[in-house]
């Protein structure tokens, strides 16, 4: 069955098109693929993939996205595990609409399938570097070659993307919306027999960025209260301003790594495919989330640790008979640990008093309960620390 004959709405972007268009990551891909949108929300890790207007799951570590992302057949369950720069590719397929028959429960809006280049027995290598405005340095390198004379081959590739921020921070702080991303991937392929092939892939990527800037506010009561206390905010009358008024640097850190093994075997009557994978994704985010020069929300942080094991088996007919068929099984085992923290700042109580219309409101409540006025509600202290774990094991 050719792509034109397949009963699917699918867009395939080959490696040449990707290179010519300077597609660095999935955020860039939306410029080539109709009906695909990639929205970066308040952190680098909270990136939402949307197909035909549908997509969710970016802001909650306990929810998997409705747009399934697969890299070489391995499911990436969270957006933080798929926002880095792309390695050397063979193609990217975007399937629009529900794809649960072949891709499982988390593909109700569609699928993004990334297929990387396989190792080659023919020696090949390249290195490329780029420079752009805001001191944007990019680099990629790739090398592949045979191992001995037995048909085995390997490849090694990596890259970096570094750029200054373009949103102006307050004096002494780092400009926001910068880039600081690194990645490396190694592959090994060999054929233990003339009917069996094995492909092993290991990869690691890291991200450490100051993100994300808020530059536009509505002129309303909450913002007017900030200004009444002498705080500064973005200019609501200038939507194109790039000045950011937070009083500390934001932190966005992602460490993502994994290993997978794919075994393809010709059984004569059918083809058997096994894909085994383990992935580890650690993220940390902290910001001054009131986005003003006052200390209202001093700390709003999230730390996630996600460990995922998947095993897929597929038995597929060769398509040379009157009936084409496929049968398979899938195991998904995932552990999620998340810690959310919120700290009030030194200006929180003053700010709440202004919003309430009078500082006497909370002082009266404190006095009635024997507290020193100004010492209890919204003090310069922890508001909450929320820790949870989620274990998910599913079979299909």
Annotated model-derived regions:
Residues 95, 123-126, 167-172, 240-247, ...:
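Extracytoplasmic loops and strand-loop junctions of Gram-negative outer membrane beta-barrel proteins
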Residues 170-176, 322, 326-396:
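Signature of Gram-negative outer-membrane beta-barrel scaffolds
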Residues 47, 64-66, 78, 87-96, ...:
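Outer-membrane beta-barrel translocator/receptor signature
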Residues 1-122:
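Acidic, small-polar-rich N-terminal luminal/periplasmic segments of exported/outer-membrane proteins
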Residues 173, 179-326, 332-340:
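Outer-membrane beta-barrel domain signature, strongest for Gram-negative TonB-dependent receptors
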Residues 12, 20-24, 134, 176, ...:
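Soluble non-cytosolic domains of exported or imported proteins
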Residues 120, 133-137, 149, 162-168, ...:
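Gram-negative outer-membrane beta-barrel proteins
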Residues 78-79, 129-131, 173-175, 246-251, ...:
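Outer-membrane beta-barrel domain signature
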